[in-house]
Amino acid sequence: MNKKLLFFKKTAALLLCAVLLLPCSACFNSPEAKNPGNDTGQITDSPHSETRNEAFNDYVNRLFTETVTTDTITLHSYMEHPSDFGIDNYEVTLGRYDLAGLDNTSDITGKLTALKSFDRTTLSPKQQITYDELLIYLQNELEYSDLFLFQTSLCTTTGFHVQFPLILAEYTFEEEKDVKEYLALLEDSDGYFQSLADYEALRSRNGYFMEDALATQIVGECENFIESAGSPDSYLITTFDEKLDALTGISDADKAAYKTANQAAVTGHLIKGYRILTDGLKKLTGTNRYQGGLCNYPDGEKYFRYLLNHSLGWSKSVDEYNTLLDSYIRSNLLTMQTLMAKDSSLSSQFNNFSFSITEPAAVLTDLKTKIAADFPQGPDVSYDIKYITEALQDSVSPAMYFLPQLDNLNINSIYINPKGTRSSQLYPTLAHEGYPGHLYQTTYFADSDPDLIRYLIAPDGYVEGWATYCELFSYSYADTGTPLLNTLAQANYATILCLYAKCDLGINALGWTESDVTSYIADFGFTDKNVAHEMYLSMVSNPGNYCKYVLGWIGFSELKKEARAQTGSAFSNPDFHKYILDMGSVPFDMLFDRLEDWCSVQSAQ
């Protein structure tokens, strides 16, 4: 939320993972590692140490601590008991934008200098992965550091103003300290929103403020929250009361006082903060100098390249990504045509295609059973299925997974938006959010005892690309009795995903207008201009968002193609998926660079 967190991109608003909204489609250990020197499962031919470099371990843990303590929402989202991680003294704050120091790169250069002071050959294989990932991350941040004013936490559907109430509702109370800190954060919220409004005013003065239509939409989302949050039965009141009542060791009188304080903080600070933001946005409406995608702004195309590099870490140009998307569209359309030519009844069957299991708990149970044949075993953890409160259903994604605390891996929450998810499509949605998607990948990664800093620099393209890959994979589990029908539905959905990423790329890198989007999707049978309008505004508001999901999935698909080609009959889905999961969330260049060594080992077995 402040300057430092702008570089580490894991602010509280990003501590959840959401499934894409497609209107035209039918995070652990203490700083002292548990297994020093145990780096089994890592494939490397580079010179390395057989044991852990303790100085490097201290460095990355110190870097993690410095970052998560800059605001308490982030700190609490990552850990319930900071003292177990050696964190005892921290300010309870939401943080602030450092408007005077936004262009100061000394923070990044200092981190790079410290990182490069380590001899990579003295690091263990696991530490070398951390080193490489951190080096790529910091170099990318430094290269594009002059574009800081493009960054904003306000965008439709996934913006901070939408996610913050959900983060507050998920704030865990394990002891009285949590209650006190939560109330202090609520009381700090108006100050934070003032800082956010001031930052947007700075962006406006420099020509980077959002289009009027987007500002109006975000103001509307804020006003909807204000209207609902002030009522006595507001979910921020009821969830607080429920969590507080479940705590032991607090007297009834103290609980009553805390409840009164919460009501006062919601109305006197949180709602006030949202009003400060809406008033600020209304004043700035009409000040935008540019229209459309990022490429219409000075250096906008460069910033879009930064977004792709940041989320994917894949050495490809915009033109190469564009070509990849075209090839996947052609390939999936050809698959559909071939299947329907083989069995003409598939066309009519496809119109009635659906997943037979529609109850969330049953879906996750079925997925956990079926993935055992295709994915390595992960840790056994618990999870809760919850529903988005009605006040936010029009604003948020169809579903989302909240990352668990590092010391509370059994507390996993999946939220379903009843307005955004049809019951017949709940199966792939929960494959994305649950098994083998976010929940499974997150807890698998945690079980590998990674360096904690990796949670803060995890590329979104890996995280969301993996979940999208799993979402598509789940079509093979549909109980239709007709595998060809499942493949047809999978290819259809894959095509739609590619169309969205193609428009994201077109709008933000190639200068597509709304009419270009309308014409493009019409060629594929989507003639509703309202859909094109929604797509256009969504991609102008949140550039690169669709690309990280879709190009991330394509990255894993390209990895699989290469692995199949190199290993031949030795290829297996469980082993391939284990390679990806054992590496953890890293840039795609790292996955491709190490693939040949892994394939050699597989072929020799």
Residue ranges and their predicted role:
Residues 22-26:
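C-terminal motif of bacterial Sec signal peptides marking the signal peptidase cleavage site
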Residues 16-21:
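Hydrophobic core
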Residues 2-15:
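Bacterial N-terminal signal peptides that target proteins for export
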Residues 32-34:
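Elongated, amphipathic alpha-helical interaction scaffolds
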Residues 39-605:
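N-terminal maturation segment of proteins
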Residues 28-30:
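Bacterial signal peptide processing site
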Residues 5-7, 36-40:
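Compositionally biased, low-complexity segments enriched in small residues
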